[in-house]
Amino acid sequence: MSRKQIYIQSAVVIFMIVLAAASRLIPHTYNLTPVGAIALFGGAYLGRNWKAFLIPIMAIYLSDFILNNLIYAQPGDAFAYAYDGWYWVYGSYALIVLLGAFLLKKVSVLKVVAGSLGASAIFFLVSNFGCWPGTVPPVYTPDMNGLMQCYISGLPFFKGTFVGDMVFSVALFATYALIH
């Protein structure tokens, strides 16, 4: 593949990631968003280097920044660069990028479906684990019962995460396959 083709391919992938991140600004059901799909797609097509992490995570961060400061902010709210527990959420995105980089070296429908399910599971497990000790005042006891209660409390949101990851993964990967 020529240098020009690689540049065009990267530009298309980046454009699709930015477009998917911008879709978060459209009202949606809880957790029915493209964030897992963005991380998976970036991991699959941006190679195993810093771009695979930086581009999807920055696109998600910029959409979070806009949502938190322009859409969800109430009058008098302080300007927010991040939110409580952000490192758990963004850590899960980094793990999803890794999943995409390794699972989707060669893209297939089955691998995209498996990757999407894996992305949902990673986000659910990591973000809820971060909620367990991270609430002030504490909501969950600092033992296995508290952790299990935290995961049980997160189950209603898993459906939106799973559907969003699946729908947006299929959309991103299928669109890219048609363009490519």
Cite the ranges covered by each PLM segment.
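Membrane-embedded alpha-helical segments of multi-pass membrane proteins
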Residues: 14, 29-46, 66, 86-95, ...
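Structural signal for the C-terminal ends of transmembrane alpha-helices
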Residues: 22, 41-48, 98-107, 175-180
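Aromatic-anchored segments of alpha-helical transmembrane domains
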Residues: 17-25, 57-71, 120-129
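Short helix-perturbing small/polar motifs within transmembrane alpha-helices
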Residues: 76-124
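Hydrophobic transmembrane alpha-helices
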Residues: 2-46, 50-55
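Membrane-interface helix caps and helix-loop-helix hairpins in membrane proteins
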Residues: 22-29, 74-83, 102-106, 155-158
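Membrane-embedded alpha-helical hairpins and interfacial helices in multi-pass inner-membrane proteins
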Residues: 105-180
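Hydrophobic alpha-helical transmembrane segments
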Residues: 10-15, 50-54, 87-91, 113-117, ...
